[in-house]
């Protein structure tokens, strides 16, 4: 409802939620909890700390501190627009101006008027937000690095919130205030998430087994086919588990990562879905293509690498599960 959405916007920070007179199952408790997880996953303190906030701060390049670098590149004020080309980071002075923020707000407002608050429009909303928020920093604090976009922060918040809601629903835990606000620290230790991955094997052989005549066109066609097929597989799975593309972390090269809720229902659905996809691949491509699926259980603290090394261990666990599936493709 409109009131639920307004509550999620108004009270997504704990300082505003603390004194609010709200029902114990108000969805804003989930939003606040998810926003905190997204924040401690993407916000890190800068080496040179200054006090206060500065709304003129541009989005920095993630490569500034990669591998010990000390770069100073950032992005120009720009919405995603194919006509303007790629917005490469620059070391030239850049300040986020007020008129740019007004343009962004107006474009989002205009697009919201044409979007219904229904399931099929969720991904359309994500597209609108991506176009407008990709080059806006999620934090303008002088004490923090500003290399994570507001779009990525909002997307992660939505992904986490949808997982938390399903996780609590399966456990019949409806007192969100107690679980996610009053006892948030202990809930950070609960295995709420699944880092889920799918990986298609046989891609190289499939793409390059084309006749010499028209080889280039054939290579492009097969590569495009695999890309579209993978996106379709992702969308179908997300629909079956009642999630959106906000939960898609990465997709490319026949591989993807998704953030899913750690529920028995999701595990049942993903297991059946993997079997169905591989049966379809066998029927259409014999044993040429195969999809391996695996996951690792994660807590909110895992997403901020606490304890140290747990974030890397999560991805290693997923990789080991995929390797095991590929080594034992078919069972009698």
Task: List the predicted regions and their residue ranges.
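Regulatory and interdomain segments flanking nucleotide-handling catalytic cores
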Residues: 1-2, 6, 14-332
């Amino acid at each position: 409802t409109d009131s639920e959405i307004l509550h999620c916007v108004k009270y997504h920070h704990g300082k505003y939620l603390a004194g609010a007179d709200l029902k114990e199952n108000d969805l804003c408790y989930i939003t606040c909890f998810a926003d905190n997880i997204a924040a401690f996953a993407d916000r890190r303190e800068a080496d040179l700390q200054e006090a206060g906030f500065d709304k003129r701060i541009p989005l920095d390049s993630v490569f500034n501190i990669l591998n010990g670098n000390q770069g100073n590149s950032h992005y120009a004020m720009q919405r995603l627009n194919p006509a303007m080309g790629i917005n490469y980071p620059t070391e030239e002075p850049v300040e986020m101006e007020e008129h740019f923020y007004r343009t962004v707000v107006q474009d989002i407002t205009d697009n919201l008027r044409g979007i219904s608050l229904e399931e099929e429009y969720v991904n359309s909303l994500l597209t609108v937000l991506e176009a407008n928020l990709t080059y806006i920093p999620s934090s303008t604090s002088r004490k923090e690095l500003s290399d994570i976009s507001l779009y990525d922060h909002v997307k992660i918040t939505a992904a986490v919130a949808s997982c938390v809601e399903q996780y609590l629903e399966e456990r019949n835990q409806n007192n969100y205030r107690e679980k996610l606000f009053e006892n948030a620290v202990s809930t950070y230790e609960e295995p709420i998430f699944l880092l889920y991955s799918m990986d298609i094997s046989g891609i190289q052989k499939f793409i390059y087994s084309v006749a010499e005549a028209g080889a280039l066109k054939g290579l492009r066609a097969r590569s495009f086919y695999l890309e579209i097929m993978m996106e379709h597989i992702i969308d179908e799975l997300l629909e079956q588990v009642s999630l959106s593309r906000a939960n898609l972390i990465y997709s490319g090269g026949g591989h993807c990562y998704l953030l899913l809720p750690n529920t028995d229902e999701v595990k049942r659905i993903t297991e059946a879905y993997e079997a169905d996809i591989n049966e379809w691949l066998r029927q259409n491509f014999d044993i040429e293509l195969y999809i391996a699926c695996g996951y690792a259980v994660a807590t909110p603290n895992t997403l901020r690498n606490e304890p140290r090394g747990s974030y890397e261990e999560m991805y290693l666990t997923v990789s080991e599960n995929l390797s095991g599936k590929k080594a034992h493709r078919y069972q009698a």
